[in-house]
Amino acid sequence: HWLGADPNGGIFYGSDYFDKCYEYAEKLILEGKAYVDDLTRDEMREYRGSDAGKPSRPSPWRDRTPEENLDLFRRMRAGEFKEGEKTLRAKIDLASPNMNMRDPAIYRIKYAEHHRQGNKWCIYPMYDFAHPIQDAIEGITHSMCSLEFENHRPLYNWVIENIFGTEFPKQREFARLNMTNTVMSKRYLRELVEMGIVDGWDDPRMPTLCGLRRRGYTASSIFTFVREAGISKSDNLIDMRQLEACIRSELDLTAQRRIAVLDPVKLVVDNYPADKTEYFDIANNPNREANDTTTRKVAFTRELWIENEDFAEVPPPKFK
């Protein structure tokens, strides 16, 4: 809401579509486009070969009939097998140079309570299978991903074409935003939170949106920064000063000025009356483009406080 987002229809959860994912998995099985495999994860990796020239081999269970695969898949859902004992794989292209297309796993057995679905499921769709299905259900036209998912796009398209028979949604990739002297990885930021090094995700030292908000950044300054940084498919490093310049430019036009002395030195004006006080009108924002005509009263007396760095008993040449 702080950034202006107001999701129509509420917040969507991927787990709400588990029933549809299961339905579409059965569709692929009946069409001969998916099969239940008995290979372990390590064996599956060995059979798939590598993109360095090692050829793949078909699983001994790749040619099971649709009827047998459907029966096994339903028994997977019923909890008749152990974790890793059975896996549902898409039947695509074992000779593809793209490893993601060499019969990827699309369902695994996992006996774990889900934070929203409870114990309803003991099989779960893999990300590359659930992602395009969820996008299609929600009417997404373009799914924006970071560059590490670029090689996953052919699989994304395969799922869309073979389940929905449409061109949309489409996946597009862009480079992650990296900033100088700043940790951006969620994994490392989580460590800072869990170790108590920071006070939480909204600690002003954190490069999170809630952290930036507590530090004083406005939503509009963040939008300005994102527009200036732009979208690229090349990895780049943005100078943190660019973000700081965005908020500084905005505050220069909107913030009223106040004065503070951090390292004070007392200054006494000997030739100014001790009992006299003069008040001067000072502009709250001297920037002419700010359109702020308000002023405030500032007192001038015999005793003043100045910054220590602004004082020198023996000033250097050209000291001001």
What are these model-predicted stretches?
Residues H1, E43-D51, F129-P132, E194, ...:
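Short, compositionally biased low-complexity segments
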Residues H1-S15, A25:
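A glycine-rich helix N-cap at a beta->alpha junction
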Residues W2-A5, K27-A34, I231:
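Alpha-helix capping at helix-to-loop junctions
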Residues A5, G165-T166, Y217:
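Helix N-cap/coil-helix junction residues
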Residues N8-G10, M144, P207:
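Short beta-alpha connecting loops at secondary-structure transitions
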Residues Y13-G14, K20, Y24-L189, D199, ...:
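Active-site cores that bind ATP or allylic diphosphates and position pyrophosphate for catalysis
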Residues P169-C246, E250:
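Long, charged, mostly alpha-helical binding arms that flank functional sites
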